[in-house]
């Protein structure tokens, strides 16, 4: 499930999120996720290191790294993309947020 993008089953300002939790860490009934926001909503001046741009289909999204949250698995909807190829960018954004590196 790590680095997969899913729809959010609950009503929220975010429609999609990326699962960032390691698959070897078992937290029964919960997953750590980062919501995605339409890239149009953020200025190009906003850090692409902290808020990476990802492309899903023909749309651009920004990872809202500072909005990382634990969600119940019951809100995880349909898988819509795999961002495994962006693993380093995702990890770097998380490292930047927590450790400034």
Swiss-Prot record:
State the UniProt keywords alphabetically: Plasmid, Repressor, Toxin-antitoxin system, Transcription, Transcription regulation
A GO molecular function held by the record? DNA topoisomerase type II (double strand cut, ATP-hydrolyzing) inhibitor activity
Please give one Pfam family short name: CcdB
Which superkingdom? Answer: Bacteria
Quick one: a GO biological-process term for this protein?
Answer: plasmid maintenance
Please give the InterPro entries that the UniProt record associates with this protein: CcdB (IPR002712), Plasmid_toxin/cell-grow_inhib (IPR011067)
Q: Which family does it belong to?
A: Belongs to the CcdB toxin family.
Q: How does it assemble?
A: Homodimer. Forms a complex with GyrA, probably a tetramer GyrA(2)CcdB(2), in which GyrA is inactive. Forms a complex with toxin CcdB; the CcdA-CcdB(2) trimer is sufficient for rejuvenation, whereas maximal operon repression occurs with CcdA(2)CcdB(2).
Purpose of the protein: Toxic component of a type II toxin-antitoxin (TA) system, functioning in plasmid maintainence. Responsible for the post-segregational killing (PSK) of plasmid-free cells, also referred to as a plasmid addiction system. Half-life of over 2 hours. Interferes with the activity of DNA gyrase, inducing it to form a covalent GyrA-DNA complex that cannot be resolved, thus promoting breakage of plasmid and chromosomal DNA.
This chain belongs to the protein called Toxin CcdB
Instruction: Give the species this sequence originates from.
Output: Escherichia coli
């Amino acid at each position: 499930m790590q680095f997969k993008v899913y729809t959010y089953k609950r009503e929220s300002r975010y429609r999609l999120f990326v699962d960032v939790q390691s698959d070897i860490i078992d937290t029964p009934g919960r997953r750590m996720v980062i919501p995605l926001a339409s890239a149009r909503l953020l200025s190009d001046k906003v850090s692409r290191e902290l808020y990476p741009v990802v492309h899903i289909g023909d749309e651009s999204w920004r990872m809202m790294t500072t909005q990382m949250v634990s969600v119940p698995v019951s809100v995880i909807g349909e898988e819509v993309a795999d961002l495994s190829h962006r693993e380093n960018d995702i990890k770097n954004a998380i490292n930047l947020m927590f450790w400034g590196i």
